[in-house]
From Swiss-Prot:
UniProt-recorded name of the protein: Auxin-responsive protein IAA8
Family affiliation: Belongs to the Aux/IAA family.
Domain PB1: from-to ranges: 103-199
UniProt organism field: Oryza sativa subsp. japonica (Rice)
Pfam family membership, one: AUX_IAA
Length: 205
């Protein structure tokens, strides 16, 4: 009996109390308390990260919009492509497209004058402007196809020296200036020749 009593007395008080009450040791409740505290600190960090991402997206959106809207009509067209296209259109030629060109120089030769001269045809006002400019350049009386028949009759009764305007087309044929519309003339003319009205070469055109 004394041995049993001493054995019961030697048992720790805490063990008997835990076994009777059914409560968990205090050491097991400490870890969940720490995890709860640590999890409670995470939401502020997540919110700050979200705000940083939103501000970054806003900055990227503003940058992209400023780059894309260079051309209001076509946002996908770069400025360099627009500039290249504009320059190409200004210098373009082709049938009936002389209005896009900046100049159209041709050589002009006059009978009896050894040196030819260059003339820009685009600024001129049709055949009338062309003949007026040539008459001023070469100090000569020049007519063209529309007046040629009337002049041929009058020319037989006068001693004045007149000249007619002819041109060479892209195929190498010599024609009387004025036999085709002005726009078609600009697309086909290669060079001009001012011939005497009584020249056999003139009447062969």
């Amino acid at each position: 009996m004394e041995c049993m009593a001493s054995t019961e007395e030697s048992l720790p008080a805490s063990s008997s109390m835990d076994s009777c009450s059914g409560e968990l040791p205090t050491t097991t409740t400490t870890a969940p308390a720490q995890s709860t505290a640590s999890s409670g600190c995470r939401p502020p960090a997540t919110a700050a990260k979200r705000r940083s991402l939103i501000s970054t997206d806003l900055r990227l959106g503003l940058t992209l919009s400023s780059v894309v809207h260079i051309d209001g009509n076509n946002p996908s067209t770069p400025r360099s492509s627009l500039t290249t296209a504009t320059v190409t259109a200004d210098r373009g030629g082709g049938g009936g497209g002389h209005g896009r060109r900046r100049s159209l120089f041709v050589k002009v030769y006059m009978e009896g004058v050894p040196i030819g001269r260059k003339l820009d045809l685009l600024p001129l006002d049709g055949y009338k402007g062309l003949v007026a400019r040539l008459a001023s350049m070469f100090r000569a009386s020049i007519t063209y196809h529309h007046c040629h028949r009337q002049f041929a009759v009058v020319g037989m009764k006068t001693n004045k020296v007149h000249h007619v305007l002819t041109y060479e087309d892209q195929e190498g044929d010599w024609m009387m200036a004025g036999d085709v519309p002005w726009e078609l003339f600009l697309t086909s003319v290669k060079r001009l020749r001012i011939a005497r009205a009584d020249d056999k070469y003139c009447y062969s055109c």
